[in-house]
């Protein structure tokens, strides 16, 4: 399945928010995410993706049909290198996992923003860790290092 990344426009903010809610719900099995009294998982930086030039959000879509398959949220807030990018949030709808959608979307993110990257897999999620380890290893031909469970690499 061929996929594309589509930059999320402010007019599509509600769609991204709904997808993010699903992702945060899914992650809550492994981290400290809690719903508030309105049944919303709060995400303090969400609005910043539409006003801050250091943050970008993309929908992952099937190229042929334009079907929505997931999303990626990227920022430039890195801790182990002087400058670069990081995947803040990343989710592929479960039905489309295990058929290269996530891998291809991640690689497209890396290709859009050449240079230094830090990838922080979800806490306590072996599945997320394995996914990112496989993607980073393949993309970098093994040329990355692991710093306290954070994948760090540079690809120009």
Language model region names:
Residues 3-18, 27:
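A short beta-loop-alpha structural element at the N-terminal edge
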Residues 24-46:
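Conserved GNAT-fold acetyl-CoA-binding loop/helix
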Residues 45-59:
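A short helix-loop-beta-strand connector motif used in the catalytic cores of GNAT acetyltransferases and
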Residues 59, 66-76, 86:
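Conserved beta-strand in the GNAT
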Residues 61-63, 153-156:
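Active-site beta-strand termini and strand-to-loop segments that position acidic
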Residues 83-94:
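Conserved acetyl-CoA binding element of GNAT-fold acetyltransferases
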Residues 92, 98-111:
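Conserved acetyl-CoA-binding loop-helix of GNAT-fold acetyltransferases
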Residues 118-133, 137, 145-150, 154:
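Conserved beta-strand-loop-alpha-helix junction that forms the acyl-donor binding cleft
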């Amino acid at each position: 399945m061929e996929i594309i990344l589509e930059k999320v426009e402010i007019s599509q903010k509600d769609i991204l928010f709904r997808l993010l809610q699903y992702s945060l719900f899914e992650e809550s099995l492994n981290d400290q995410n809690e719903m508030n009294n309105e049944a919303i998982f709060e995400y303090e930086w969400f609005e910043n993706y539409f006003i801050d030039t250091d943050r970008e959000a993309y929908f992952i879509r099937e190229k042929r049909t334009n079907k929505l398959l997931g999303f990626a949220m990227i920022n430039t807030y890195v801790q182990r290198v002087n400058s670069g990018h990081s995947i803040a949030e990343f989710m592929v709808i479960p039905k489309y996992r295990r058929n290269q959608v996530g891998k291809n979307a991640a690689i497209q993110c890396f290709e859009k923003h050449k240079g230094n990257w830090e990838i922080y897999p979800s806490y306590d999620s072996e599945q997320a860790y394995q996914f990112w380890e496989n993607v980073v290893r393949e993309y970098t031909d093994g040329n990355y290092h692991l710093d306290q469970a954070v994948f760090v690499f540079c690809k120009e």
